[in-house]
């Protein structure tokens, strides 16, 4: 019975969910080889001055691959395999994080995600 009540609560009143943290991405969808991929991640429910935002990707049929992170203070860490062509920055006042990967190759085909 408790499970049904929780399910009803989640479906009927989304505000029952413990956290209203949201990360919404916007980008071009498809990018041609040799071009750059730029994605904006707009966050709500938390402050970029308090939490870092990570970027990961999932190639078709494979697991998640960590690409990099921008920390609350603005410093960044990158996967060594991408450090020469990856840039992550942010605008705290707009609650936005920016991801840019240059010189795309066929094996960069993946779904890209931002994550808290």
From Swiss-Prot:
One GO term describing the cellular component: immunoglobulin complex
Keyword Iron: no
Cysteine disulfide links: 41-114
GO biological process: adaptive immune response
Keyword set, alphabetical order: Adaptive immunity, Disulfide bond, Immunity, Immunoglobulin, Immunoglobulin domain, Signal
InterPro entries, per database record: Ig-like_dom (IPR007110), Ig-like_dom_sf (IPR036179), Ig-like_fold (IPR013783), Ig_V-set (IPR013106), IgHV (IPR050199)
Span of domain Ig-like: 20-116
Protein name: Immunoglobulin heavy variable 2-4
Gene name linked to the record: Ighv2-4
């Amino acid at each position: 019975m408790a499970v049904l009540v929780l399910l009803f609560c989640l479906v009927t009143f989304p505000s029952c969910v413990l956290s209203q943290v949201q990360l919404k991405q916007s980008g071009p969808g498809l990018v041609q080889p040799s071009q750059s991929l730029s994605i904006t991640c707009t966050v709500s429910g938390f402050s970029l001055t308090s939490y870092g935002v990570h970027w990961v990707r999932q190639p078709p049929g494979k697991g998640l691959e960590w690409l990099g992170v921008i920390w609350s203070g603005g410093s960044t860490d990158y996967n060594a395999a991408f450090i020469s062509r990856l840039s992550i920055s942010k605008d705290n006042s707009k609650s936005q994080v920016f991801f840019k990967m240059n010189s795309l190759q066929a094996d960069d085909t993946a779904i890209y995600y931002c994550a808290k």
